[in-house]
Amino acid sequence: MCSLFGLIDFKECLSTHTKNKILNTLARECQVRGTDATGIAYNFNDRLRIYKRPLPARKMKIHIPHGVNVVMGHTRMTTQGNAQFNQNNHPFLGKVDGSSFALAHNGVLWNDKELRMEENLPMTSVETDSYVAVQLLEQQKTLDFDSLKTMAEKVDGSFVFTVLDKDNSIWFVVGDNPLCVMFYDGFLIYASTQEILCKTLKKLRLKAPIDILEPQEGEIMRINRNGRITTGTFTPHTTFEHWWRKYPFYRSYYEDTPASYDDLFSVAKAFGVTADEVQALLDYGCSEEEIEEMLYDPELFHEMTGELLYAY
């Protein structure tokens, strides 16, 4: 479980200070979905810049230079690939036709190893499943609706991809994970969930947006630096394994023993965490492994569960 976030100041109406404030607030609110690493990508002086560190957003000060109007970000909860090796963190750098792009992913891909063999993709030291999306785009030597469609239809898993290109457009490739974009008069912000954006607005004391967009599964959306939107579609690659992972509660019909979280509750109790807090995260969709990892950061754990239990 990770989070995507970012902004496009398409009328160049925000000061650099305001953009940095928005980005830092967004990133910190995104910690609810990942604290292992934080990263951003933007274009500056005709070069794509990626800044990422194996740190939670609250410990990493995001600072973009004057003149940057498009920023793509990511907060990570590790599923594959050690976050301490920074190459495994998002966004990732890719190149097509001599131009650089940055890609970030929220979700889990299950056929990355198979794709590397089937597509004869080059060996890489990057250990994450997400990086196969970069390689599939590089293989096609172009970045457009067709290449993104091809990539999205080859990967199997849960995903939303964001891609920042050299022209300062952000591409959104929406699978079965959430995404929300809020529009204002002159700029937009986005994150993986509307809840994250609402909490960000509250902390920044921003007014209600003039429009909210939540793209659906199978949509590809490009928003350029002027705020113009163009769209395309793809057919999600769905397999029985994907369905089985997405709807694990169906397993209870076939397993002799229903899932029990007694061990998890006992471990949590040793950390001073109540069963209600653990259950709130389970209901939210966190796995046992994710919850056990979060137990080692009690301050963040209680902050997250507090928001889930007492959300306004």
Where do the protein language model's features map onto the residues?
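Conserved short alpha-helical segments that host acidic/polar catalytic motifs at enzyme active sites
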Residues: 1-312
